[in-house]
């Protein structure tokens, strides 16, 4: 544990186009080397593609549906008990759920095969909103791991 005091949570401002805090967080995860304008163009470009491809839902609804489908409810954490390390399933706090979902979506998008990051991100968001894709698979794997280690759930802290 750190001996210092806990770091304060920084407030992020809502994004200019949709006025959504989660979209700003998402942009910050997409951003490289402080290039916010580039990240903004990528995310808004992906939202434009979503709007064109998916007529039944708006881009913001598709984005939030994708996040909900990727967010894990439970994960495993290592716990050392008497020389043995157990993978103990624990519930995920809401803030961490959202952070993991965003991280998994961005990483899954980066590893896709399309040409531009805008297309990759739009494709992954579309897949995740309809419960497919690498990010959803990552969530399923996490849940499977927690289910497999359910016997150790009494070691929860």
Swiss-Prot record:
One of its GO terms (cellular component) is small ribosomal subunit. Pfam families: Ribosomal_S7. The keyword Ribosomal protein applies. It comes from the Bacteria. CDD domains: uS7_Bacteria. Gene3D superfamilies: Ribosomal protein S7 domain. This is Small ribosomal subunit protein uS7. InterPro entries: Ribosomal_uS7, Ribosomal_uS7_bac/org-type, Ribosomal_uS7_CS, Ribosomal_uS7_dom, Ribosomal_uS7_dom_sf. Keywords: Ribonucleoprotein, Ribosomal protein, RNA-binding, rRNA-binding, tRNA-binding. Part of the 30S ribosomal subunit. Contacts proteins S9 and S11. Belongs to the universal ribosomal protein uS7 family. The keyword Transmembrane does not apply. GO terms for biological process: translation.
């Amino acid at each position: 544990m750190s001996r210092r005091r806990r770091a304060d949570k920084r407030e992020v401002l809502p994004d200019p186009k949709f006025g959504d805090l989660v979209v700003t967080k998402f942009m910050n995860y997409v951003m490289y080397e402080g290039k916010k304008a580039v990240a903004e163009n990528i995310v808004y470009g992906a939202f434009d593609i979503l709007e064109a491809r998916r007529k039944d839902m708006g881009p913001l609804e598709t984005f939030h549906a994708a996040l909900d489908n990727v967010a894990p409810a439970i994960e495993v954490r290592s716990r050392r008990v008497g020389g043995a390390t157990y993978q103990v399933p624990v519930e995920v706090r809401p803030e961490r759920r959202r952070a993991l979902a965003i991280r998994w979506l961005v990483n899954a998008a980066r590893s896709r095969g399309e040409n531009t990051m805008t297309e990759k991100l739009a494709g992954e968001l579309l897949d995740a909103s309809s419960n497919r894709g690498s990010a959803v698979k990552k969530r399923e794997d996490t849940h499977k791991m927690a289910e497999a280690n359910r016997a150790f759930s009494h070691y929860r802290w």
